[in-house]
Amino acid sequence: MSLMVVSMACVGFFLLQGAWTHEGGQDKPLLSAWPSAVVPRGGHVTLLCRSRLGFTIFSLYKEDGVPVPELYNKIFWKSILMGPVTPAHAGTYRCRGSHPRSPIEWSAPSNPLVIVVTGLFGKPSLSAQPGPTVRTGENVTLSCSSRSSFDMYHLSREGRAHEPRLPAVPSVDGTFQADFPLGPATHGGTYTCFSSLHDSPYEWSDPSDPLLVSVTGNSSSSSSSPTEPSSKTGIRRHLHILIGTSVAIILFIILFFFLLHCCCSNKKNAAVMDQEPAGDRTVNREDSDDQDPQEVTYAQLDHCVFTQTKITSPSQRPKTPPTDTTMYMELPNAKPRSLSPAHKHHSQALRGSSRETTALSQNRVASSHVPAAGI
């Protein structure tokens, strides 16, 4: 039984630990950007650092790229506004949390957050093959190209945070391009693309002109597209977190009620064991009462008064014979006590004299009923 309890507790702990890890961990905060981590040059972005452990003081630092003096170990309360951004702001950021009562103790670092600064190079061009309007189920390919020798292209869809990227490949017409296959089209959307260099991966060009992809035979032209595996993966990940947390909570509830049931059972067993000796004593007392006979002592009192009687004739005698009155008195029950030999002898003597007295009394009564001879 104890092994099952330990197993349930371990399963719940690891499930809950896995769920917490996806959201930033047990003792580290979660860092995010609003409205987006892709910021145009000269724009502003708000960095939010949140924690489940009640941290109210946060420290922000940059891991790579050019250091930003005003952000070096910056202390802030939950959020900080960064901007106007420059190429120096591009890079990877983390934050730490602390309590006001212990400002020198900091939590583990948060998840990494990449800030991308755009508008540093000329914009590329974006096109769709076979065209921007396709039928449902038809394969679509988006091509991002530029005459500049960029190393990487990034495809962005409106309303989606993750941007897939592909390396640039020289084409026959002297341009550098990357082809993004979307697969069978089911939904449309608005797309743009960016270009970047290897030595500055977080400094992007201006966005291309937006391209609207329409899918005929579907009423929702701006819904999710076939290039949404990342968003679906995010949904599955959050669903996994929700399921894991729910299972852990259910296991802890079951464990709580199981321990409560065991505690109540132990208390009931202890109460029954405490009552058993008292019950045995009651039964023994009743058995002793049943074994001891209820002794009742009767004392017969003779009310015959030996007085001088007058002999009368039989005709004057009462027709109803005299009735001897006997009175009984029940004495309280008492356990018989052992008598000493002297007491036993005295009791036997009293019984003998009592029998003699009773016999003498009966003889006298009988003689009083004998008819007298006529004179």
Swiss-Prot record:
<dbReference type="GO" id="GO:0002764">
    <property type="term" value="P:immune response-regulating signaling pathway"/>
</dbReference>
<dbReference type="InterPro" id="IPR036179">
    <property type="entry name" value="Ig-like_dom_sf"/>
</dbReference>
<keyword id="KW-0472">Membrane</keyword>
<keyword id="KW-0393">Immunoglobulin domain</keyword>
<dbReference type="InterPro" id="IPR050412">
    <property type="entry name" value="Ig-like_Receptors_ImmuneReg"/>
</dbReference>
<keyword id="KW-0812">Transmembrane</keyword>
<feature type="disulfide bond">
    <location>
        <begin position="144"/>
        <end position="193"/>
    </location>
</feature>
<keyword id="KW-1003">Cell membrane</keyword>
<keyword id="KW-0675">Receptor</keyword>
<feature type="region of interest" description="Disordered">
    <location>
        <begin position="334"/>
        <end position="375"/>
    </location>
</feature>
<feature type="transmembrane region" description="Helical">
    <location>
        <begin position="239"/>
        <end position="259"/>
    </location>
</feature>
<feature type="region of interest" description="Disordered">
    <location>
        <begin position="213"/>
        <end position="233"/>
    </location>
</feature>
<feature type="glycosylation site" description="N-linked (GlcNAc...) asparagine">
    <location>
        <position position="218"/>
    </location>
</feature>
<comment type="similarity">
    <text>Belongs to the immunoglobulin superfamily.</text>
</comment>
<dbReference type="GO" id="GO:0005886">
    <property type="term" value="C:plasma membrane"/>
</dbReference>
<dbReference type="InterPro" id="IPR013151">
    <property type="entry name" value="Immunoglobulin_dom"/>
</dbReference>
<keyword id="KW-1015">Disulfide bond</keyword>
<keyword id="KW-0325">Glycoprotein</keyword>
<keyword id="KW-0677">Repeat</keyword>
<feature type="compositionally biased region" description="Low complexity">
    <location>
        <begin position="219"/>
        <end position="231"/>
    </location>
</feature>
<feature type="domain" description="Ig-like C2-type 2">
    <location>
        <begin position="137"/>
        <end position="200"/>
    </location>
</feature>
<feature type="disulfide bond">
    <location>
        <begin position="49"/>
        <end position="95"/>
    </location>
</feature>
<protein>
    <recommendedName>
        <fullName>Killer cell immunoglobulin-like receptor 2DL5B</fullName>
    </recommendedName>
</protein>
<keyword id="KW-1133">Transmembrane helix</keyword>
<dbReference type="InterPro" id="IPR013783">
    <property type="entry name" value="Ig-like_fold"/>
</dbReference>
<feature type="compositionally biased region" description="Polar residues">
    <location>
        <begin position="355"/>
        <end position="366"/>
    </location>
</feature>
<keyword id="KW-0732">Signal</keyword>
<feature type="signal peptide">
    <location>
        <begin position="1"/>
        <end position="21"/>
    </location>
</feature>
<dbReference type="InterPro" id="IPR003599">
    <property type="entry name" value="Ig_sub"/>
</dbReference>
<feature type="domain" description="Ig-like C2-type 1">
    <location>
        <begin position="42"/>
        <end position="102"/>
    </location>
</feature>
<feature type="topological domain" description="Cytoplasmic">
    <location>
        <begin position="260"/>
        <end position="375"/>
    </location>
</feature>
<feature type="topological domain" description="Extracellular">
    <location>
        <begin position="22"/>
        <end position="238"/>
    </location>
</feature>
<comment type="function">
    <text>Receptor on natural killer (NK) cells for HLA-C alleles. Inhibits the activity of NK cells thus preventing cell lysis.</text>
</comment>
<dbReference type="Pfam" id="PF00047">
    <property type="entry name" value="ig"/>
</dbReference>
